[in-house]
C-alpha cells in the first residue's frame, strides 16, 4: 500500500465539518441538528471495509482516513462532529483525530481523522 501523501497538491477534497447542536424549532421545542462550522481542503484515504450484522441485517461500513492541515478550527473537532465531502455529499462519522507525525519535524502540521461511512451520523 502506498504511503499517504501530504502537501497542498494532495488535498483534493473540500470537507465541511459540522457540530451537533440543539436549537429551538418554530414552536419553541428543542430540536437536535447539525451546525456547520468550517470547510477545509483535505484528503480521503479509504481503508479495508467490512460488514457488521445489526439487528439481523448486514450493514456495510467503509472506514477512511481524513487528512487535513492542523489549524485552530480543525483542533476543535471531536468524535461528536461529522465531516461531509462537499461535492458528493458523503457524510463521515468521526471516530478519532490524531497527529500522525508526533516526534518528527512535521509534528503539528497535519491531523488524521479516522472516520466511517455507512453508519449513523
Predicted regions span which residues?
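Short, conserved turn/kink motifs that form compact alpha/beta structural patches or helix kinks used as
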Residues: 29-121
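Active-site-proximal polar cores
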Residues: 1-30
Amino acid at each position: 500500500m502506498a504511503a499517504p501523501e501530504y502537501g497542498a497538491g494532495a488535498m483534493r477534497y473540500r470537507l465541511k465539518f459540522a457540530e451537533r447542536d440543539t436549537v429551538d424549532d418554530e414552536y419553541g421545542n428543542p430540536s437536535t441538528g447539525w451546525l456547520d462550522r468550517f470547510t477545509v481542503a483535505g484528503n480521503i484515504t479509504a481503508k479495508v471495509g467490512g460488514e457488521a450484522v445489526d439487528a439481523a441485517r448486514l450493514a456495510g461500513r467503509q472506514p477512511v482516513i481524513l487528512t487535513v492541515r492542523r489549524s485552530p478550527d480543525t483542533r476543535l473537532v471531536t468524535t461528536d462532529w461529522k465531516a461531509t465531502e462537499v461535492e458528493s455529499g458523503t457524510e463521515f462519522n468521526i471516530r478519532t483525530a490524531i497527529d500522525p507525525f508526533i516526534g518528527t519535524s512535521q509534528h503539528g502540521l497535519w491531523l488524521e481523522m479516522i472516520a466511517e461511512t455507512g453508519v449513523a451520523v
